[in-house]
Amino acid sequence: MTAEVDYTIDELMAVCIARQVVDGEVLAQGLATPLVVAGYILAQATHAPNVAFASAIGQGLCYDWSPLGVATIEELWLGNSVLHTGFVAAVADMLPRLHLKEFFRPGQVDVEGNFNNVAFGKNYERPRMRLPGTGGIPDVTTFSDKIYLYVPRHSRVTFVKELDFVSGLGHSEKRTRGVGVRYLISDLGQFDWANGRMRLTSYHRGVDMKRIQAKTGFELEIAPDVHETPPPTLEELRLLREEIDPLNVRRLETLGGTARRNLMREILEAEGAL
């Protein structure tokens, strides 16, 4: 009998992100998305050695990587980049030409894969909470065929019947180009939009489908071959823990409150920034 592999949810999510990467792709990542970056680097270190990384930090393109950090994150992208562009050139020129794959973290997402990163609340002038903003999301999601999403904390706050605002275009009748969101990974399972509606394709270890539905604000479709998410391999875990992210920066995206603050302090102390 094979022993059960011990892993954390952030490690599983990073591995699932890595497994969505195809060798030769250009991978885009926004600001403060270490879970995605860990997955991208893991893909290059395993099955996709020929990927390139495009970062919102400095609008740079690079082929090499450094271990994840907080105080040192700019060094990862600015120090390894082979070129830098301005933001407008990155959105209007680089993104359409290179057909980048990108994982976005939505504040809200609906059954069709439309998503909101503007604000919570219908009143834009006085929202309940102002979100990070759209960046290039409204542009990219109207034409790209490689839009992917990730949600570190699956809840009915994020998965809603109706968005407060729309910043990312999903499987909408208004779409004239692109195919809409292809895939979503959360801390509960993996999903696709094979029929234009969000569909559960796998559930993580220890999670049942009733719990996933209860934490989703609309009715989910279920894939005929729905199954448990395959676990990380020992080598994938070793790479994440020892080489790619020994400081556990990726875990910041799964935590909140005191736990997140404490981990942030640990990371900054380890980097010598405090």
Feature map (PLM): residue ranges:
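N-terminal active-site beta-alpha-beta segment that forms phosphate/nucleotide-binding
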Residues: T2-N80
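Residue-level detector of alpha-helical recognition elements and their boundaries
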Residues: A32, A54, R128, H227-E228, ...
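Short, intrinsically disordered/low-complexity patches at protein termini
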Residues: V51-A52, V140, I244-L247
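Short, surface-exposed, charge-dense and proline/glycine-enriched linear segments
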Residues: I57-D64, V82-F87, G135-P138, L252-E269
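Conserved phosphate- and dinucleotide-binding cores of soluble alpha/beta proteins
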Residues: P67-P232
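A conserved C-terminal secondary-structure "cap"
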Residues: P224-L274
